[in-house]
């Protein structure tokens, strides 16, 4: 027994970013509820099909006869969950947010609403269509009038769609904004044709790619900018993500389908892109032909199948990612912007085939999650426009599906988004068309602030780097010159400044080397002295107490107390002796170092003054550097002397502390000693 259940049709709602600037022929309207009276005429009863008289013909507009059914319009349900987003509006009603979808560039950001376009699929049926378009308005006598940024009628070609939607998106892409275009609609309504097209009539994807490389070619003539383009292609099939450009995952067979493992690719949070598909292939491309070749490869790997509406229908959501990186060759900075071109699978009713029913369930689940996200964002947009806040606008469930998870950065203000919703105006598709229009109405209510991926000039940092590089080059040249002059004398027999003889017949380079060697030996000796000092402090000093008063006090105390006190005093005296020896050693080393420096200075400049050296050899950088090094060494020795003084002060403080600790004990012992009666003293009578 086979159970055939109807899969819940999504009240789909699409991805949102920020709207595009106003283009020729486009108008933006607020979709708030019409304050005036509305005509509410219901549709057909459940299970019945209504064949409605056409509202527009080549000869004009006809009035529609009254419907025998007086039920509430299903479109009015949108006002219950989505505020005014799903409510029709009279053409004469005032717009509370007129021009909301027209973005405004403020500083380094972009504000506006989602740009929404409707495209009506041409119908060959003789049945009269209930929907018609007029001046970017979609009109249905029962449901009312809906106004969008663009409404493309049946005679509009892909080139016109691209001029209205694609060109502004590419302009914003080159300004540094991320951009997203996605097609939404029921199965067989023309989404894939709008996005991909055919050889005779290319769709949005090939035309956007061509425009990108045309812009790169025109802007590349200036030598200050360089561009890099990478392409990726993924699909979401049965809530799993697959890489359509990964040849490794292809099965060895004639099916031509990629192997779909049990897990698919994973999504991870990314600091740069918001979210990132791990291990997704990125192919570097250099021309329009390269991109289309990779997209064709992905199309062959994409999962398709036959449905009731199409012989070759998309059974997965497909997303083409184009990453455009712009390099400023003058400053070395870069900026990356991403164009996402999404062809979403269409919702459909359950079918009898098990595979198709499973695919449809996953598709409807993801579209339903997308619809929920859009509905909540629409509520937030209504609150931003000053309308009454809705209690349902709380947590936004981006993680309910892979589709909403990937679109999360765009929906949260990381991308300018244009949505093109394709509908079939036939009466047989009335339910799906109604859901699509409700989706478009809610999406248009979303307001976002899009961040711009600006090229960080770092002017101050670049100046510092240039100065440091210049200084490094100068020092490198000086070092090379010194090494050459120290290696061999010049060809005319003259000696270099470093090789000029000084006192004792030694050259300056030799004296410098000897001085450095002496300083290293002094430093090594000081370190050895410190090590010996620390080792001695670890050993317990068992020398007899030198202070006779302290020895007398210790002898008068009980044995246990006397031993403890003697041990403590011995340790303190041992430390004092070690400190004295250490201080004397430091003073001796410091005196020797000062004498060596004075001697070195006299050796260097004894026979010739600084003025004579400069007169003979010009501005001698070597001597200046040597003087600077000696100044630094002298400063280190002075610091060592300061540390010695601080150490002496610490020892003196410890001595005072010891004296203060022993003074009460000494007083008590002396008093006790005086109280003892000496037998030799005369006894009182």
From Swiss-Prot:
GO terms for molecular function: ATP binding; ATP hydrolysis activity; microtubule binding; microtubule motor activity; microtubule plus end polymerase; plus-end-directed microtubule motor activity. SMART domains: KISc (SM00129). Residues 113-446 form the Kinesin motor domain. PANTHER family: CENTROMERE PROTEIN E, KINESIN HEAVY CHAIN ISOFORM X1. Its main location: cytoplasm. Residues 86-101 have a biased composition (Low complexity). The keyword Cell cycle applies. One of its GO terms (biological process) is microtubule-based movement. One of its GO terms (cellular component) is spindle pole body. PROSITE patterns: KINESIN_MOTOR_1, KINESIN_MOTOR_2. Keywords: ATP-binding, Cell cycle, Cell division, Coiled coil, Cytoplasm, Cytoskeleton, Microtubule, Mitosis, Motor protein, Nucleotide-binding. ATP binds at residues 185-192. It is found in: Cytoplasm, Cytoskeleton. It holds the Pfam family Kinesin. Residues 11-46, 63-101, 485-510 are annotated as: Disordered. InterPro entries: Kinesin-like_fam (IPR027640), Kinesin_motor_CS (IPR019821), Kinesin_motor_dom (IPR001752), Kinesin_motor_dom_sf (IPR036961), P-loop_NTPase (IPR027417). Required for assembly of the mitotic spindle. The gene is KIP2. Belongs to the TRAFAC class myosin-kinesin ATPase superfamily. Kinesin family. Residues 464-486, 520-663 form a coiled coil. SUPFAM superfamilies: P-loop containing nucleoside triphosphate hydrolases (SSF52540). This is Kinesin-like protein KIP2.
